[in-house]
Every structure is written in C-alpha cells, then in structure tokens.
Amino acid sequence: MALYEHVFLARQDVTSQQVESMIEAYKGVIESNGGKVEKTEMWGVKSLAYRIKKNRKAHFTLLNIDAPPAALAEMERQMRISEDILRFLTIRVDALEGEPSAMMQKRDRDERKDRERGRRRDDDGYVGERNEEG
C-alpha cells in the first residue's frame, strides 16, 4: 500500500467536534477500502493568506494515511462533495513521520515561550497577560 500525507481545510464556522466527526467519517472511508490512518493532527483554526469561498480562517487537519490509491480517491471524492471542506492536498511520501509535524512542534514551542514569559494565548491567537487575581 502507498503512504500519503493529507491536509484539509474545513470552514471556520464548523466546530471542533464537527471536524472530529469529519475525521472519523474519512477514517471510516479509508478503513472500509482496506487502508488505515496512522496519525491525525488537528492544527487548529488559522488565518488564510487569502479568502477561500468567503472564509478568512479555517480548521487545518493533517492525516497520515497508509492505503491503496482507490481508498484515497474515494475519500477525495467525498471531500469534493462536502461544502464544509474548503481545500485539501494529498502528497505521496516514501515514509510517514512518527514524530509530531513541524506545525505541531511550532505550536508547542510558541506555547512554551508564552508560559516562560507568563503569558497565555486564547483560541484566536491573542496573547495577553495572565490574570493572577482569579
């Protein structure tokens, strides 16, 4: 079977729970066609470089997939039909990475720096001072 990295962008209006249910549905498609999803990473809501279908932000998600090409073709067909998916990209790779992706490592570094400075980030990326009073 072939190895793939698949990234998709879901509309900003969709909740995190809905994104998780989409991931489970796409995992089901892959598994029913003889493949499996090795790793899933939700990168969160990020700003887009330009508007896509009237959206300025999107939920970014990475799937590492070990599946036959037919399974991937079916998943991509379903993503094209879905109105909640703005874009997707699938790349065939020689080996899947076992460690967290560069996006997850960057997010972890940023969170660590903020903790060291006594700051926190909210969901929109706003950095503010910690309120120690409660």
UniProtKB/Swiss-Prot annotation:
Annotated Gene Ontology MF terms?
A: small ribosomal subunit rRNA binding; structural constituent of ribosome
Q: Where is the composition biased (Basic and acidic residues)?
A: 105-134
The alphabetized UniProt keywords are:
Ribonucleoprotein, Ribosomal protein, RNA-binding, rRNA-binding
Q: Which Pfam family, any one of them, does this sequence belong to? A: Ribosomal_S6
InterPro entries, A to Z: Ribosomal_bS6, Ribosomal_bS6_sf, Ribosomal_S6_plastid/chlpt, Transl_elong_EF1B/ribsomal_bS6
Q: Where is this region: Disordered?
A: 99-134
**GO BP of this protein:** translation
Any one cellular-component term (Gene Ontology): cytosolic small ribosomal subunit
| Stated role | Binds together with bS18 to 16S ribosomal RNA.
What's the family? Belongs to the bacterial ribosomal protein bS6 family.
Q: What is this protein called?
A: Small ribosomal subunit protein bS6
**Organism for this UniProt entry:** Methylobacterium sp. (strain 4-46)
Whichever gene encodes this chain, its name is rpsF
